[in-house]
């Protein structure tokens, strides 16, 4: 898989969207009503996209070592989650998620249960997900990806 600006952009957008879907489904089920977990009312959770790109760029060489890949993905995603939680709390003066009730948590920002999940999801994305995603994107007709032509506004003075 070739990582370039386009492929990293695809990984970022798709994983941001899939993260939003997962977060929204879980929050909706737990709350009993629709809960949009996206950023700025859009269908994206940017931490998932950012972490997806980080893992793709950093750990592609570990594809032949799945155990090391798992622990690398787990650590990187957990650090990203902790940093994001701290930044969001500092910027918005509220905790966006709280794992204080879970075993083996660090200040309620991260916990072992989700770190293991991030490790498994990160490993799956690096081993298979990114390749499948980019193969699917390669099936999109080129004309759909071309930017629309920009025509200058008609001049009021001739």
Annotate each PLM feature.
Residues 1-158:
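Aromatic-rich, lipid-facing transmembrane alpha helices and their immediate juxtamembrane interface loops
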């Amino acid at each position: 898989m070739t990582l370039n600006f386009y492929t990293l952009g695809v990984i970022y957008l798709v994983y941001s969207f899939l993260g939003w879907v997962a977060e929204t489904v879980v929050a909706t089920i737990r709350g009993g009503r629709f809960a949009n977990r996206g950023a700025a009312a859009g269908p994206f959770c940017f931490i998932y996209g950012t972490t997806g790109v980080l893992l793709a760029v950093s750990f592609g060489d570990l594809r032949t070592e799945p155990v090391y890949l798992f622990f690398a993905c787990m650590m990187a995603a957990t650090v990203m989650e902790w940093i994001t939680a701290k930044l969001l709390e500092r910027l918005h003066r509220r905790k966006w998620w709280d794992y204080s009730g879970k075993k083996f948590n660090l200040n309620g920002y991260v916990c072992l249960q989700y770190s293991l999940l991030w490790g498994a999801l990160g490993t799956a994305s690096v081993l298979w997900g990114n390749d499948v995603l980019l193969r699917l994107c390669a099936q999109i007709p080129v004309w759909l990806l071309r930017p629309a032509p920009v025509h200058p506004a008609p001049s009021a003075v001739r």
